[in-house]
Swiss-Prot record:
One of its GO terms (biological process) is phosphatidylserine catabolic process. It catalyses: a triacylglycerol + H2O = a diacylglycerol + a fatty acid + H(+). Keywords: Autophagy, Endosome, Glycoprotein, Hydrolase, Lipid degradation, Lipid metabolism, Membrane, Signal-anchor, Transmembrane, Transmembrane helix. Its EC number is 3.1.1.3. This is Putative lipase atg15. The keyword Cytoplasm does not apply. It comes from the Eukaryota. Residues 473-492 have a biased composition (Low complexity). Its main location: membrane.
């Protein structure tokens, strides 16, 4: 009975508490509305209600479809290696003169924007974080960097949004995005129109800042409701020194190699020292190198945050080619943005290592298993970079120093089968974006159907381990000391020194050597061209006699007639060495042959056969 009354009391208190809160909220609501507090740039419409979850009105899906005409509005340049503090912006005006460089960096021509860039939008469903403020995203990335794995977020932190995204089923729209990526090689020569977003130095007089860093081109439609960020991809030059090729190679080998260019060809450029043994590496060391502030991914995050400050309410799309396409996809996975890439390097490997947020039910170590990412990767089967096969010993990528070992894409792949359809051979020359536009995108009547990649894994031969990041490399040297003791010698005083030593009398040393040898004594009766043709008749074992050698004993103790090279006094030896030769048969030949052998008539001799003891 008491228990039942207690439950009723608790229920009444909860009901009273909830009613009191609603009454207080209704009383404070007019005051909140009348307040003139400045709105925050990160505020959302549902932030004013602390009790009810945000109710997003369901829009008509037909309103998400439309046509957009884009124009180039800005060029952002984010420094990395040589100028890590550099971040500049060039606003495109009607009088701005731009130049387009060829993909090999040798030719240039004036840029023309007469052809409109038209793309269609289509509803796209993306599973992304509900709170996508840059400060919140940075907290998730920092936690992943400190712990070594992606942050574990609850299911309530994720939303399934349907928004207006690029129509990847429309050929003209796909061509428009490809042309945007081709224009990523635009440079502005000899102008002072660049604005410093932040930076401690004046780079207007520097000639090298444009060759260092990541460049992004910002396209916007007429209403500024949709913008496209296009990131610059890898230049095709194989050797260092052409524009940003050196930095591109460092980032390629850092993000898309199993261990920073280690453990493979000696031609690969190594960008870290994290390998500990054959196919074994320190994953913590690799992740720390990838998160350095002078890397392209960090530059892409900074570039995106500055672009969204200019267009805070715009719908953002991403596009890029090659390395720029991979950075585009990583940026899209981070913020939940639709991305369209062309011939992008497989980027699932760096996505897993960077610790990008992953929704519940998905393994963060396998981002290629995620669905609803909004990423679409266009490419063809003759491109070894896109297919993840540009890593063999004889491949052009290897000879150029690139270690592209990753093979898995996130999102969906839209593949043109140029090998079967056109009989193309796999070659690096088909990777260039202008060749892709003219020979693939414009030639095919329809775009391929996009589908996720199935059963793909990276670096299966490698073993990775984690550490606390405080290890340092030590070298152990083992020194072996060998002490040699010289043999004992007798020391005496030389009474008669000479020019080349002491002339005192020497001592007598007797050396006795005893050995047993087996000899064969025969007489050749039938000599041949290449030796004796007689059969072996007997074998006699004879012990070798002892050999005794006696050194002469000098009788003189003083030198009466010293010379330049010794004493000229006569010496008298006390003994003479004797040597007893071993017994043997002696046969003389009276008629020798012209070349070898003996022509004497055959003689018969008896040889007794003895039995060995």
């Amino acid at each position: 009975m008491k228990s039942h009354q207690g439950h009723q009391k608790k229920r009444r208190m909860r009901e009273m508490g909830f009613s009191t809160l609603l009454l207080g909220a209704s009383l404070l609501l007019p005051v909140s509305v009348s307040a003139s507090a400045p709105p925050s740039i990160y505020s959302r419409p549902y932030d004013s209600s602390p009790f009810l979850s945000p109710q997003i009105p369901l829009e008509d899906l037909s309103s998400l479809s439309g046509t957009h005409e884009f124009t180039l509005r800005h060029i952002f340049h984010r420094g990395t290696y040589q100028h890590p503090d550099l971040h500049r912006r060039l606003d495109i005006q009607p009088h701005t003169q731009l130049w387009v460089l060829s993909e090999d960096g040798t030719d240039k021509e004036a840029a023309e924007f007469d052809t409109p860039l038209i793309a269609s939008s289509h509803p796209v469903t993306i599973q992304r974080l509900a709170d996508r403020r840059p400060s919140v995203i940075e907290e998730h990335l920092l936690a992943a960097r400190m712990s070594g794995s992606a942050s574990v977020l609850s299911e309530s932190d994720w939303v399934m949004d349907t928004l207006a995204g690029p129509d990847v089923t429309d050929k003209n729209s796909v061509l428009t995005f490809a042309k945007m990526t081709a224009n990523d090689y635009i440079q502005e020569p000899d102008t002072e129109d660049w604005q410093d977003i932040h930076g401690r130095f004046n780079y207007s007089s520097s000639f090298g800042w444009q060759t260092d860093g990541l460049r992004g081109h910002i396209y916007a439609d007429k209403t500024n409701s949709t913008i496209v960020i296009s990131l610059k991809g890898t230049s095709p030059a194989l050797f260092d020194g052409a524009g940003t090729t050196t930095n591109d190679k460092l980032n390629d080998n850092l993000y898309f190699s199993c261990c920073c260019g280690q453990g493979g060809s000696y031609l690969w450029r190594q960008v870290c020292d994290c390998q500990k043994s054959a196919f074994t590496a320190n994953l913590t060391c690799i992740i720390e190198a990838m998160n350095d502030e002078n890397r392209y991914y960090r530059a892409a995050l900074d570039l995106y945050s500055n672009v969204t400050e200019l267009y805070p309410d715009a719908n953002v799309w991403l596009t890029g080619h090659s390395l720029g396409g991979a950075m585009t996809s990583l940026l899209g996975l981070t913020y939940g943005l639709p991305a369209v890439t062309f011939e992008a390097v497989p980027e699932a490997l760096p996505a897993a290592r960077l610790g990008l947020p992953s929704p519940p039910g998905h393994d963060p170590r396998l981002p290629q298993s995620r669905r609803y990412t909004g990423a679409y990767h266009f490419g063809h089967t003759a491109d070894p970079v896109y297919m993840g096969t540009c890593n063999g010993v004889s491949s052009v990528c290897t000879w150029g120093g690139y270690a592209m070992e990753s093979a898995c894409h996130t999102g969906q792949m839209c593949v043109y089968d140029t090998v079967d359809d056109k009989g193309w051979r796999v070659a690096i020359g088909t990777h260039r974006i202008k060749a892709v536009i003219s020979d693939v995108l414009e030639v095919y009547d329809d775009v391929p159907q996009c589908a996720p990649e199935e059963e793909c894994y990276d670096c299966e031969l490698w073993k990775f381990f984690r550490s606390n990041g405080s290890e340092h490399t030590t070298t152990t040297t083992t020194t072996t000391t060998t002490t040699t003791t010289p043999p004992s010698t007798s020391t005496s005083t030389c009474k008669t020194p000479g020019w080349w030593g002491c002339l005192d009398e020497s001592t007598t040393t007797t050396a006795t050597s005893t050995s047993t040898t087996s000899t064969s004594t025969t007489t050749c009766k039938t000599p041949g061209w290449f030796g004796c043709k007689d059969p072996t008749t007997s074998t006699t074992a004879t012990p070798e006699p002892s050999l005794t050698t006696t050194l002469p004993l000098m009788t003189s103790t003083t030198c009466a007639h010293p010379g330049w090279f010794g004493c000229r006094d006569p010496t008298s030896p006390t003994s003479t060495p004797t040597q007893t030769p071993p017994p043997g048969d002696t046969t003389s030949c009276e008629s020798p042959g012209f070349f070898w052998g003996c022509w004497d008539p055959k003689t018969t001799s008896d040889h007794p056969i003895t039995t060995p003891p």
